[in-house]
């Protein structure tokens, strides 16, 4: 059964010849990992699936590794310099501290809010403390 929900891309790593395993933080399912086929090469599909991408995830499967049907990027958080490193730290915290399939809508909302504030140029220390 196909499912759809908002998701933030946390981490991407190559898998086999042209695929990737992607860690997503979703509002309803928490952190989930999925296989994106046709990720590398000339495909435009891989361009949208990058860390700091927020969008709509469509997938199927209920195992620990879902099959991603599509990911439509609604917003890419463009971070630079120290803000980029802080953003990577935030994504790493989500990857390591949120259990797989653990529903955490407040954490998802806080992460998106923090990245939005960081992108807007608000004080970095305050953004991270609020998270």
Regions found by a protein language model. Name each.
Residues 1-131:
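Non-catalytic alpha-helical scaffolds and adjoining flexible linkers that form interface surfaces
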């Amino acid at each position: 059964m196909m499912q759809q929900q908002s998701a933030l891309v946390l981490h991407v790593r190559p898998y086999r010849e042209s695929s990737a395993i992607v860690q997503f933080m979703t509002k309803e399912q928490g952190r989930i990992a999925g296989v994106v086929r046709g990720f590398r090469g000339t495909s435009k599909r891989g361009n949208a699936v990058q860390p700091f991408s927020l969008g709509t995830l469509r997938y199927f499967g209920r195992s620990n590794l879902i099959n991603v049907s599509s990911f439509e990027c609604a917003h890419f958080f463009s971070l630079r310099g120290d803000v980029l490193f802080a953003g990577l730290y935030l994504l790493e915290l989500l990857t390591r501290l949120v259990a797989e399939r653990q529903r955490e809508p407040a954490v998802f909302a806080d992460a998106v809010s923090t990245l939005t504030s960081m992108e807007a140029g608000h004080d970095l220390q305050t953004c991270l403390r609020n998270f």
